[in-house]
């Protein structure tokens, strides 16, 4: 489904501010796989997502999505087949448009449908009802008036409406309060499972990284230093994961946000 081969990205090359953000990273993702990605700040997690989406072009290497080499394909073209949620709930939807208009835009996936049929509107309401937030009764409400959790749940729905080939979740619950974050995370696992989506999820919650999906990778210095799945992953604890990081990278993970990040009652043992 997704094959990344030896990609490199250097920012400000040849200057005092030179930063090797991606350091020969390779990754193969199978169809329908749900991978959680962890790592300290500056490890290259969001940079990897930006490379996949085409926010910038990599300096070297290739990115192949569903058999098509997209390494040099512009970002707006890739956006038609890649869904992405950001940490900021304000991104991913149009605040000046109402809920229905945002859904119409998402359903068009790059094309504007000026009029929605009664059947389409009914379908939108049915999908919104699944979120359990009462948004199905607020179709004409401006998105800018929604709470952060409501807006992130709506954005999740919008990003998956057209069944993207790849779904990227960039700490999409980090800015929400614990209760809302738990609800959005539960919705995420349900939608990914029901739609059989291929998904990469960045998280700073190490327990979530082990509980959700079927594979966990850890990044450091712009590369993958640890990759676990199957029985090995099932047996891992957070402490064991930290030990494996130290063994793989040769250094201690010193990041308060990761070490202290816990969300109670995280949905466990999510499988496709």
Residue ranges and their predicted role:
Residues 61-68, 226-228:
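Conserved ABC transporter NBD signature motif
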Residues 1, 10-24, 74:
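A short, flexible loop at the N-terminus of ABC-type nucleotide-binding domains that lies
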Residues 38-40:
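The feature captures the beta-strand-to-loop junction immediately N-terminal to the Walker
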Residues 15, 57, 69-83, 91, ...:
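ABC ATPase NBD coupling module
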Residues 203-204:
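H-loop/switch region of ABC-family ATPase nucleotide-binding domains
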Residues 159-160:
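ABC ATPase C-loop
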Residues 53:
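Helix-to-loop junction immediately C-terminal to a conserved catalytic motif
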Residues 234-272:
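ABC ATPase nucleotide-binding domains
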């Amino acid at each position: 489904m997704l094959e990344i081969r030896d990609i490199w990205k250097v920012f400000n090359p040849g200057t005092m501010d030179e930063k090797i953000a991606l350091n020969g990273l390779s990754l193969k993702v199978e169809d329908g796989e749900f991978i959680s990605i962890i790592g300290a700040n500056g490890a290259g997690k969001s940079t990897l997502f930006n490379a996949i989406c085409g926010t910038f072009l990599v300096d070297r290497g290739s990115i192949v999505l569903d058999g098509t080499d997209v390494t040099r394909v512009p970002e707006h073209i890739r956006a038609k087949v890649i869904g992405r949620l950001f940490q900021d709930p304000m991104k991913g939807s149009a605040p000046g448009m109402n809920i229905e208009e945002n859904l119409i835009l998402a359903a068009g996936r790059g094309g504007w449908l000026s009029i929605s049929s009664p059947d389409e509107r009914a379908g939108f309401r049915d999908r919104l009802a699944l979120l359990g937030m009462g948004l199905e009764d607020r179709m004409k409400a401006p998105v800018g008036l929604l709470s952060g959790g409501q807006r992130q749940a709506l954005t999740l729905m919008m990003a998956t409406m057209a069944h993207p080939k790849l779904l990227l979740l960039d700490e999409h619950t980090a800015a929400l309060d614990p209760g809302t974050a738990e609800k959005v995370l539960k919705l995420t696992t349900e939608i990914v499972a029901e739609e059989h989506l291929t998904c990469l999820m960045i998280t700073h919650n190490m327990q979530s990284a082990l509980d959700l999906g079927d594979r966990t990778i850890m990044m450091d210095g712009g590369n993958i230093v640890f990759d676990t799945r199957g029985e090995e992953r099932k047996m891992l604890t957070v402490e064991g994961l930290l030990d494996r990081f130290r063994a793989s990278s040769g250094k201690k993970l010193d990041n308060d946000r990761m070490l202290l990040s816990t969300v109670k009652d995280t949905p466990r043992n999510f499988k496709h």
